[in-house]
Structures are given as structure tokens and as C-alpha cells.
Amino acid sequence: MEDLIVAIVVGAFSSAISIFVVRKLDRAKFEVFIEQAKAKAKVIEHEAEMALKDAQLKAKIECDREFKSAKREYEAMLLKIERKERELNEHLESELKAIKLEKEQIVEKNRKITTLKDGLEEQKKTYEEKTLEAIKILENACGLTQSEAKELMLKKVKEDSRAEISSIFRKRYKIAEQNTKNEINNMLSQAVTRYAGEFAAERLINNIPLNDEETKGKIIGKEGRNIKALEMLLGVDIIIDDTPNTITVSSFNLYRRAVATKTIRELLEDGRIQPARIEEIYKKVKSEFDKNIQKEGEDVVMELGIKTMHPELIKLVGRLRYRASYGQNALAHTLEVAHLSGLLASQMGGDAILARRAGLLHDIGKALTHEAPGSHVDLGAEICKRYDECDTVINAIYAHHGHEEPINVESAAVCAADALSAARPGARREVLESFLKRVEEVENISTSKLGVLNAYAINAGREVRVIVKAELVNDDEAVLLATEIAKEIEEKVQYPGEIKVNVIRETRAESYAR
């Protein structure tokens, strides 16, 4: 349509130009040309009208075709929707019919169940009545009530079952006991054979050789002044006249005896033996021993492969070197228990390092028993709790004396190792231990009194020397104190013969000249 209009415009424009040209060229022919142009214009206009009508007709035909196509699609879609709706309605009606039928069936089943339930209740009632009648007949026949008959039957069944269970249990128990014994014996034998420790029984005396008899006179001093100072300061018995060229140092306390022996040896080497020098050497030796105790503990901990331990506990381990139980050195016993505990725990699938730690600390309370009241078990548990030792160590301390049950393999290993070490033939001497306990008890009674500084049992426990503080106890009170201590010893300690209580009160005055 647009092309047609453009053609018409172009033609008209061309005609106008032609007319203009014709006018200019030939006025005479202008009219003819005008007529021709009009004729052409009519032809063109007619053609344009025909083309326009043709285009309109084509457009109408195309619109009708598209409309009919859209109408057909719409009608097809409408039919499809109607069909789906009809199918859904039919399905819904079918479902509703099924639900209605199922509901009717449920109602029918409920009715039948109710009928059966009523019938069962009736039968149950009849059964109970018949049962009661039968029970009454049986009770009349056997002379027992229902409860009595039930008790009799249960008793019989229980007795039969108990006898059978007991028989099975005894058999199984014997087998388990034998197997356990065999396994334990095997473990213990392997652990004992794998550990070869050193052992030496502790003595009560140390002998110091002398070069000549003149040295004895130096030790005794003028009017026995030096030997009295030594015995009072060191807390030991010093015996000079029994053996030629020998000084015997006697004490149940290993630490005091070792310090005394070292002090006397250094005095002999120094040659200057008099009370002031004795006290000076004693302080020096005691300081060295305290340092050695710490090193001894560190060496033991390192030997056992224990990485960390509180310094105070290490110091107490070192002090066990100077403790004895039934003649057995406490540190040697502790080391033996620690090694055996580790071996036993490893064989039982436990932690060998933890077992060795618990074994090392199981008798740690013995390092404190001279200074603090109470059993070594309670003291050891308390000190280990204070320094944050684990529950296994605490349990092992209590368990090895039966105060608690072992809570794990490591604690059980410590208990077994302690029993092995103590029960080994020749490991302990009962007579010596009873003597040591008696002497310790005498010292503890003495030191428990107010104003007492130190107490030393000497002369094989037949005498106790009590050193008191001069500012707290006067001379009259010292006499009363000696009587009180002697009376308490009589009441609490069993001993042969008699024990001499010697209370010593000393006042010192010091001044310096500069």
C-alpha cells in the first residue's frame, strides 16, 4: 500500500514537471499535453484504487484466516479443559464412593469387634467363675489356699533353680579362679624374673675407724664435753670403748646416723674437735645432706622415666633413702615396687609410666612420719593431693593397704608389686621393725609436749633425751615434764626393762666483740 502511494506521488510530481516544461516549450501543445496527463493520471489513479482494493482484500482474507485459526485453537483448548474437568469429576466421584465404602466397612468391623468383645467379656466372666469353683474344689481337696499353694510352688521352683545355679556357678567359679591364678602367676613370674634389683638390709650402727687411741681422747674431750655435745646435737649414741680403734654410731634414725657419721669423719679429718667446731661442722654437713636428698630424688625420677613431678615430692622421694621399714630401706623398696608395677601394668595392657609413678609415690608418706602425726597412708595421700597428683596415684596409696579397692590396672599393679616386695624372703625383719616402732613412739610422745624442741631415743631405746626451749620451760616445769612423759610412755608403750627420761634445758648467751 505504501509503495502504491509513493508511485502515485512520484507520477504526479513527474507530470507536474512535464507540464511545466511543456508550458515553457510550447504553449500551443500545452492543452493536449494536459489532456494526456489527466488521462494518465486517471489511469494511475484507477490502478492505485485497484491495488488498494486488492491489498485490502488480501488483508481481510489474512485476518479471517488467522481469526479462524485462533478460534479453532481456543475451541480445542476449551474441549481439552472440559475433558479434564470431566475426568477429574469422575475420579473424585470414584474416590468418594471408595471412601464411603471403606467407612461402611469400618463401621461393620467395629460392630463385629464390639460383638466379639461382649462375647469375650461374657466368656471371661464364665471362665473366672469356673476357675474360682475349681480353686475351691482344689483347696478343699488338698487343704491349701491358693496363696499357700502358689508360695509352695514358687519355693520349690526357687530351691530347684538355686541348687542348679549354685552347681553351675561353683563349676564356673573354680574354672575362672584356676585360670586367673595361672594367669596371675605367669604375669608375676615374668615380672619378677625381668627385674633384678639390689637389696641390702639396713643396720642400726655405723663404724668409724680410728688411726690411734689418742683420737678417742679428742672425741671424748675434757670431762666428756665433746662427746656430750656430739650426742646432744646429733641425737645418736656414740660408743667408743667397745671396739679398739673404732667409734660406733648407733641410732634407729638412718638420717641422723648418716649425718652423725659424716660429721664425725670431717671432725677427725679437721682435727679441731671442740663444741663450737662440732656445731659448725654439723650445720655444714646437714646442709650438704639436704642438697643430696634433692639430687637423690631427681636421679630416681629420671631413672624411672617420669618426666614431671613437683619439686617437694622429689625431695620427699630423696628422703626415703633415710627411712626403713622392717629393716628394708624405704627408697629401695619404693624403687622395687615402681619397677615391678611398670612391668605388671604393661603385661596387663595398662600405662607402665603411670604405674611406675604410682609405685614410686605409694609409700611417700613414710618420708613424713617422723615429723607429722598420722599413718603414712593418710600423710602420703594428703601430700599427693596437695601437689595435684592424679586419682590413680591417690588410689594406689590407699589401696596398697586395703583402705580402698583399686580403680584400674595401674593401682592393682602397685598393690601386687608392694606385696611381692614385702613378702620376698629376707626382705624384712619383724623384730627390728617392732623395736624401731617402739623407739619412734617414745620420741613422738616426747615431742608432743608443749615446749619440747627435740627428742632423741638413745642407748637402744632405754633412754630418751628431751631438749626443751628454755624460754618456755623453767627448771621446775622440766621435772614435771619428765614425770609426765615417763607416765605416758608407761601407759602407751610396751617395752622390756625401763626407759630413762632425761629432760635437758640449756640457756645460751651470745655476744660479739668487734
Swiss-Prot record:
Compartments (UniProt record): Cell membrane
EC number(s) given by UniProt: 3.1.-.-
One GO cellular component, as annotated: plasma membrane
Superkingdom of origin organism: Bacteria
Transmembrane annotation, as ranges: 2-22
Domain called HD: residue spans: 330-423
CDD domains in UniProt: HDc, KH-I_RNaseY
Domain named KH: residues: 204-268
GO BP: mRNA catabolic process
Topology within the bilayer: Single-pass membrane protein
Recorded GO MF terms: RNA binding; RNA endonuclease activity
Broad class of the protein's primary localization: membrane
Broad class of enzyme this protein falls into: hydrolase
Annotated keywords: Cell membrane, Endonuclease, Hydrolase, Membrane, Nuclease, RNA-binding, Transmembrane, Transmembrane helix
Family of this protein: Belongs to the RNase Y family.
Function: Endoribonuclease that initiates mRNA decay.
Name recorded for this polypeptide: Ribonuclease Y
Gene: rny
